[in-house]
From Swiss-Prot:
GO terms for cellular component: sperm fibrous sheath; sperm principal piece. Changing S775L: In a breast cancer sample; somatic mutation. May be involved in the later stages of fibrous sheath biogenesis and spermatozoa capacitation. Inhibits ROPN1 and ROPN1L SUMOylation. Binds calcium. The keyword Phosphoprotein applies. Residues 21-40, 200-220 have a biased composition (Polar residues). This is Fibrous sheath CABYR-binding protein. GO terms for biological process: negative regulation of protein sumoylation. Interacts with CABYR. Interacts with ROPN1 and ROPN1L; the interaction increases upon spermatozoa capacitation conditions.
Amino acid sequence: MVGKSQQTDVIEKKKHMAIPKSSSPKATHRIGNTSGSKGSYSAKAYESIRVSSELQQTWTKRKHGQEMTSKSLQTDTIVEEKKEVKLVEETVVPEEKSADVREAAIELPESVQDVEIPPNIPSVQLKMDRSQQTSRTGYWTMMNIPPVEKVDKEQQTYFSESEIVVISRPDSSSTKSKEDALKHKSSGKIFASEHPEFQPATNSNEEIGQKNISRTSFTQETKKGPPVLLEDELREEVTVPVVQEGSAVKKVASAEIEPPSTEKFPAKIQPPLVEEATAKAEPRPAEETHVQVQPSTEETPDAEAATAVAENSVKVQPPPAEEAPLVEFPAEIQPPSAEESPSVELLAEILPPSAEESPSEEPPAEILPPPAEKSPSVELLGEIRSPSAQKAPIEVQPLPAEGALEEAPAKVEPPTVEETLADVQPLLPEEAPREEARELQLSTAMETPAEEAPTEFQSPLPKETTAEEASAEIQLLAATEPPADETPAEARSPLSEETSAEEAHAEVQSPLAEETTAEEASAEIQLLAAIEAPADETPAEAQSPLSEETSAEEAPAEVQSPSAKGVSIEEAPLELQPPSGEETTAEEASAAIQLLAATEASAEEAPAEVQPPPAEEAPAEVQPPPAEEAPAEVQPPPAEEAPAEVQPPPAEEAPAEVQPPPAEEAPAEVQPPPAEEAPAEVQSLPAEETPIEETLAAVHSPPADDVPAEEASVDKHSPPADLLLTEEFPIGEASAEVSPPPSEQTPEDEALVENVSTEFQSPQVAGIPAVKLGSVVLEGEAKFEEVSKINSVLKDLSNTNDGQAPTLEIESVFHIELKQRPPEL
């Protein structure tokens, strides 16, 4: 204060003068002239009021003096001295000052008002911040806070704030306040973080800007860092606030996503919120559980999934998925970005095994193992995925399916696990959060490694070329493998456990493979687009190992055809070979494809997104806005990636084939050819289970698929957009998309197809998904026909592999939709 008072002696006086005026208004405010006093009082009025105000102030000050003693004393002495001086000069200067300041302040306050208006923060908090901001302001605030925090603040801002800002207090006070605010922010106490911005606004627009910046940075950092607290807080608090800030965090997610709208939002709030919510809601558990647990969470879900796996998983998981997904999804949606990141991250995480895709190519080897894991993963994924997948997948798928598809898929896949995480986290920072989420999530998720790599990797990768490739691959792999990866070994066992293990595995593999296949198609596409070759290859390798293992030979041939057919026979074969699993893959491919189809439906959408690069189309369709936006972006990229091209084919192929099959449930049938063998079984068993897994896988896949292509693109291209988009549209898209997957459920399939067609009837699917899950398989048939019809439509979109029914996928997907939607909303 001394330095300040000295440096701003005159200024202080001015401030005081202004303050007295502020006081007047404040006094007035106290009096009851809250709004009016602020802008209405003229300098003279202020003077007169000021006199009384000062008296009041002094009185109040004294009153608050004890509380404000340190602050007030500092300010009091200085202020009083200055005030005394000012009292004399006050009339003259303050008037001018106040007029000028007022004008300036008016400008500031206007913005500030808006910002400040939020004074949801307790006056006390404001007080603290304010007092911290400026002793004078602080104590004034204290005095005034109770009366009209907002107005006083604004007025204060007018004078004290504006002047202070002008003065240099911004440096000291503002900085101080900022720091305090940040602290508060960190504490989440006041939302100072949030409001600090407001408060800062109060402090000054400059400060607000700084704070906002700080906040944003801080929040982002926080997001990335502890800020989770802040974020959480913000998220939590913000959830509401954030919602406000974000949108409502999208739900929370939405709002949060919107938070994206908020500046922080995206970065922090949204993800944070959602993420947090999601993370909290699900991610944290899911995240931790999910991610870490991925097996764990998923594990639980896994167990559940395993237990309920197919149905239960679907159902159970879905609920959880839905449940979490809802939250999560929101997160996911939100995750979009972060999601994406996380997604990626997740992917990465998941992928990490994949090598995070970066290694994707290498990882392929890695992945390969993961592929081995892949199955497990898949199973886990299947389960996890189911759970997650369902949960995430759903989210993911949908999300991924569309815009999310791209991203979500990435997200989804990993997100499946991570999705929540990714979702959540991603959501969180969206981008920064993304990373943070990524890190956080990943870290949290356990995927830390993955995350790290993923985050770094994946995000980067996925986002970057890797985004495509990694995405493609990762997703592909990740989707395919990472999940597989992570869980793989386990999963595989579990999976194996399940018969589906192999099938599932195969399936998973299929998913993986399929995913890879589909994905690969995607990947291929992606590959085309991204490079995928590695992914492909890897998939091929990974898949081969895995898939091959299952029906590397058989499916591959068949699937290969389809797959190959779908995207790149060449590649597909690679993949497909792995897709061997393709039989499963075929199935899965169906599933995956289906998923793809579903996803594709989404994919279609996404593919549409991707295909059209129909990013627009699908995205437009699905997430048109977001999807479009992200997808468009993403998609275009994907399109670029080839996803558009390839994916379409794959999408088409997958969707077409898958979808039709999906439509059919026939996946078993259709897939039968490919899936036939494993699929039939798998499908049957897995169908439920596998479906889940497959779906998951598929979902995963598609996500991977779509996502890879898209996400890769998205990741890469739209990462940010994606993030937001993903979040946004992922949510929406995911919703839409999710549904498709849900639709995919078979009933959903049809819905899927329908959804796909509809694009998301997904919503309906959303509803359906869970329910249909069980039905899915069954309904799949009935729906299958419908779906077939739809598939026909989709077929148009994805004529290639119509045969393969993505019945499975549906399950995974639907969860998301529900979740996503809110987020979307």
